[in-house]
Amino acid sequence: MRMREAEGVSAERLARIAPVMRAEVDKGTFPGAVSLVARNGRVVHFEASGYLDAAKTRPMTKDAIFRMASMTKPIVSVAAMMLVEQGAMKLNDPISNWLPELKDLKVETAAGDVVPTRPVTVQDLLRHTAGFVYGGSTRSPRIKKMYEDLNIEALEKDITAGDMLKNLGTIPLAHQPGTFWEYSISVDVLGLLLERVTKKNLDVVLREMLIEPLGMKDTTWWVGADKRTRLAETLDSDAQKTGMLKSYRHFDDPAVRTYLKGGAGLLGTAEDYLKFLQMVANGGEYAGRRYLSKKTIEFMLSDHIPGMGGTTAASTGPGYGFGLGFAVRAQDGFAWTAGSKGDVMWAGAWGTSFWIDPKENLVGIMMSQAPSNRVQTRMLFKNLVYAAVVE
């Protein structure tokens, strides 16, 4: 019996992925993609489809480098929990312990700005319940304008970490801390907090704690000239391409910047990201080295937002809550794809996505650069993979 069947995955059904990916290339969904599936810690599917470049002249390769955007967030979240395990901070610590620029935050209400009922905590940053927002998605016109005017997200021009925090401290929160889930800059703020805790730049923190020990050799904040030919591109026809390229400036050496976004800054390969995800799927251990305890991983992959307002559905579809750095399937029904209660996922705005299914010991990664079609592609790939799980 071949390995694929031995891992309870049908080789015949996995073979459906390649023609579907080719069809998406032909339809103009993306130039190309890399898809990877592991079951029981073994790779059962790893394919490159289509092309690296927008002109469709260079074949996609398995070692292609992708802008991962928000798939940076789980890595920063794991680093934060490693520091919690080391006693450097606690989840219920106010973030102002390290970020005094944010000690006088107010909360926007219909009756005016009010004092928060409690401080924003480290846990709030990890689970997006701090009251911070993304300017493009918040329902508050006032907060949206303030984020834009004060360059909080550094979308088209850089800002120093100090100025970002100083400016953020003047903007009210959209919700009382710990009451409402709203996708936000929280992990950008968490990255700055990690810098204060460790007294190191965020790129150094992640490199020392996770990237180098895991052997993620192509995971980086910027693409040097020697690897630029491996960078996957977006079709010129993608309506979001121009704006996204302005917002994600990955050809700049981070040494000249003081604000590295913990929520969106990394690039990497599918194979690199599998090492990180497999460590999480293994309960915090990879290749003989322990990064987090089994119980900490279980805690991170639990739903931390029951009873709160807000929903993750725009990114996950229905049926998901949110843990510490990961969306968590809260129940077996309602979701748009097959899966298991307790499976976790997240994705990136450029078109990358992943999930971990602890019950099935299954990890899936889809790497493409198709911001306008990102939800469609992540659901399509997930359906194809679960259709191949037969034991």
Model feature map: region roles:
Residues 343-345, 350-359:
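Short, surface-exposed beta-strand/loop micro-motifs that present aromatic residues
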Residues 354-355, 361-370:
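Short, well-ordered beta-strand elements
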Residues 5-68, 88-90, 104-111, 375, ...:
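Short, conserved catalytic-motif segment at the N-terminal edge
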Residues 15-22, 41-43, 66-95, 187-195, ...:
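Active-site SXXK
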Residues 103-339:
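Short, surface-exposed loop or secondary-structure junction motifs
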Residues 48-50, 94, 368:
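Short clusters of small/polar residues that mark proteolytic maturation junctions
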